[in-house]
A protein has these predicted regions:
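Conserved helicase motor
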Residues: 330, 351-361, 377-382
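Proline- and acidic/polar-enriched loop/turn elements at helix boundaries
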Residues: 26-27, 352, 444
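Hydrophobic positions in the central parallel beta-sheet of the AAA+
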Residues: 325, 373-375, 400
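A generic local structural motif
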Residues: 175-177, 310-312, 357-361, 385-388, ...
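Signature of the SF2 helicase/ATPase Hel1-core->accessory helical subdomain module
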Residues: 165, 201, 210-211, 378-388, ...
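Conserved motor-coupling elements within RecA-like helicase/translocase cores
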Residues: 355-373, 389-392
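Short beta-strand/turn micro-motifs composed of small residues
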Residues: 192-193, 327, 402, 443
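ATP-dependent helicase/translocase motor core
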Residues: 1-322, 331-347, 368, 378, ...
């Protein structure tokens, strides 16, 4: 099979998955039905305008020019900075202004409808020629939603012994240099020779290009002959792909450098399962045990926790919940806090850290909705003279996210102390303080079968990704 045959097979899979397929040559500037003014144009403006009018009936049509200008004229010379700015507009809407009678109105135009798949137009285009800084370039397949290119697939022939997926990876690096405007809007890159396929972010190196092994959920792992088919049926499932670009993309600043991180398949499905389990557990009639996510160490637990928080905060069923993130040690608290602080596009709020017991109690007692609060488990210790922890907040939409829950003295049962008084573990104090909160645990090590305390607080596993899965 040569590269053209693989490309056609790939387009067939997109078609079967509900995407429209268009050949780049048929919409080129010099075709009989041009959808581009010239070969430098990246956006399919007719689709973008149709999407704008469909998704923004509250705005005058004149606002479309403002949207087009903001998308076509990024503010920075740095690609990743522009990509981050676009991602923020994608989630929050593009700022527009218009005159209504005598007043100027400030509003937002939305580019994608994340809640209604059928309100969007999904098009896979092959051989879309773009005039680069040195020569014309033709990525194999570009995935457009409402005229915006969200993903690029670069393919190599499975039978060519002199080419492999890393040649495709190198080709993408060249494209980023020569046709960088295409990547301002990018949310995923795929390299494949059909048999092997890897998915990575705009800034990912080879090591961070990872397989995508699932289709509908984490148990749906068909042993397909072509890994590329799994990527197209799973990662590019239209509903899942929208969820992905909305809740599973993070930016981290490391000194001067911005890194874009996207979730792996195990993180994506674990978070989706955990959010559903939490909604059920947090219900006034729920058991308040949202479960335990066990993902082997080194598999990106902090990203999973951050994406879970971002998705949970936006669930209408949670009525703007408060999240309390509990760690066992100060250094963990700091690391995780940094990841969350970097993710404000996703979380839409700034997390706070409780520095002592009094501050923690104040944060929790005053909160009527929303908020992300970090603390260590030790701050639930009793004050002098207290025999039990006072109730701080009785709301049902508080979720306690625990990092490495089972490391601490999480006991619910009383133990007789040396001074003849009964002492409870922190879990009992947390439960007393937040009597209607739901609890979820994230861990990199399995819970022992004898550990009944952890299960009593959190319930059973909601997702497992162990060493075997990670290989």
């Amino acid at each position: 099979m040569n590269e053209t045959q693989l490309e056609n097979l790939c387009l067939d899979w997109f078609l079967e998955n509900g995407w429209e397929v268009v050949h780049g040559i048929d919409i080129a500037p010099d075709s009989s039905n041009p959808l581009r003014k010239d070969y430098k144009q990246i956006l399919i403006e007719a689709d973008l305008q149709a999407g704008f009018e469909r998704l923004n009936p509250h705005l005058p049509v004149s606002c479309f020019e403002q949207v087009l200008q903001k998308l076509n004229q990024p503010e920075s010379l740095d690609l990743v900075t522009n990509n981050r700015a676009f991602h923020r507009m994608l989630l929050e809407g593009v700022p527009v202004t218009y005159k209504k009678q005598d007043d100027w109105v400030h509003d937002h135009a939305f580019l994608v409808d994340f809640n209604h798949v059928h309100q969007n137009r999904f098009v896979a285009v092959n051989q879309f020629t773009i005039l680069g800084t040195k020569q014309p370039r033709r990525p194999d397949i570009i995935c457009f939603i409402n005229g915006i290119p969200f993903a690029v697939l670069e393919l190599k022939s499975p039978t060519d012994e002199n080419a492999d997926i890393w040649d495709a990876f190198n080709q993408l690096q060249t494209y980023k240099e020569e046709i960088s405007d295409l990547f301002v809007f990018n949310e995923a890159l795929v390299v494949s020779d059909g048999v092997t396929a890897r998915v990575g972010s705009l800034t990912a190196n080879q090591e961070r290009f990872l397989p995508w092994r699932t289709i509908k959920n984490e148990d749906d792992k068909p042993a397909l002959e072509w890994e590329l088919e799994t990527v197209i049926r799973g990662f590019f499932d239209r509903e899942l792909f929208l969820d992905y670009i909305r809740f599973f993309v993070l930016f981290e600043t490391d000194g001067e450098k911005t890194i874009k991180k996207i979730a792996g398949y195990h993180q994506f499905h674990a978070v989706r399962e955990a959010v559903q389990a939490t909604i059920a557990a947090a219900n006034p009639n729920g058991d308040k045990k949202a479960g335990v996510v066990w993902h082997t160490q080194g598999s990106g637990k902090s990203i999973s926790m951050c994406c879970y928080a971002g998705k949970l905060l936006q669930q209408p069923a949670m009525h703007n919940p408060t999240l309390l993130i509990v760690t066992d040690r100060n250094d963990l608290d700091g690391q995780l806090f940094e990841t969350f602080s970097n993710a404000q596009e996703l979380l839409k709020q700034t997390p706070v850290q409780a520095n002592n017991r009094d501050e923690l109690r104040k944060f929790l007692a005053e909160r009527e909705s929303g908020g992300i609060i970090f603390t260590t488990v030790q701050k639930f210790a009793l004050l002098e003279g207290e025999s039990e922890h006072p109730l701080l907040n009785g709301r049902h939409n508080i979720v306690v996210m625990s990092d490495e829950a089972h490391r601490s003295q999480y006991g619910l049962k009383a133990k007789l102390g040396n001074d003849g008084t009964y002492k409870f573990g922190y879990a009992k104090h947390m439960r007393d303080a937040l009597k209607n909160a739901a609890f979820i645990g994230f861990t990199g090590t399995p819970i022992s079968s004898e550990d009944k305390d952890t299960r009593a607080v959190f319930g059973d596993y909601v997702s497992i990704y162990d060493i075997q899965d990670a290989v």
